[in-house]
Amino acid sequence: MKSTIARWSMTLLAMGAAAQVAVKAQDLSSSRQSVGQPSKDRIVIGLGAAVTPVYQGADDYRVLPLPAIDIVEGRFFANFRNGVGLNLVDDRALTIGAGVTPMPGYRRRDVPTGVDRLSWGVGGRVFANLTGGGVVATLGATQGITGSTGGFVADASLSYPIILNPKVIITPSIATSFADGKHMDGYFGVNAREAAASGLDQYRGKAGFKDVSALLNIVYRLDSRWSLTGSVGATSLLGRVKDSPLVEHATRPNGFLALAYRF
């Protein structure tokens, strides 16, 4: 079994970012219809599904059931992008937080015969969200800390929520990520034993920018509690990582749909 991590794909990371930004936009939309400063506390829970490659660069797709979660209670948060943790700084323009987040890999049946699977782990994450001029900029970093995890991934994104009307919010986003050599080799590498068993060429991953994504997220508020969220986008691998024998397509589209309830 490989001893290094695979984090959430950039596809799912971007979806989580857009969903969080959309919730904040809903807060803004609601505040325009109310008096005084609304509380940031919220509990949003739902269920969705992502249509995404079985791993980054794969030819095959899978439908992956996913929770839709965005909880803020005081300094505590739990959401799809940043995991579970505490907001250390939280005001209108800047949020800085830290927590732990799952770091999933890929199944043995999803990769060529002879290539090991990557098992789940847990990573420590820190992030900062900066809001200004209607744009939400996010910087984050995740380090594997438990299980068979290891390696470091940094990510950055820009989102621009647009309130079309009280019911519809669209959020275009772009994102990119950088990974160290340990992560790159763990996810995209093929060692000598795997090469002999699979017939693939050996490949050793090195540190560098890993991918870039573009996403369009749409939220439709069914009523004051229920909302429907849909996302469509694409992720492209960058640089040397495209030379990995595991990569069949450098650019792959993806989608996400969820129904959520706000308590």
Where are these regions (language model features)?
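Transmembrane beta-strands of outer-membrane beta-barrel proteins
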Residues: 41-47, 78, 94-98, 137-139, ...
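Residues that define the transmembrane beta-barrel architecture of outer-membrane proteins
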Residues: 41, 61-67, 92, 118-124, ...
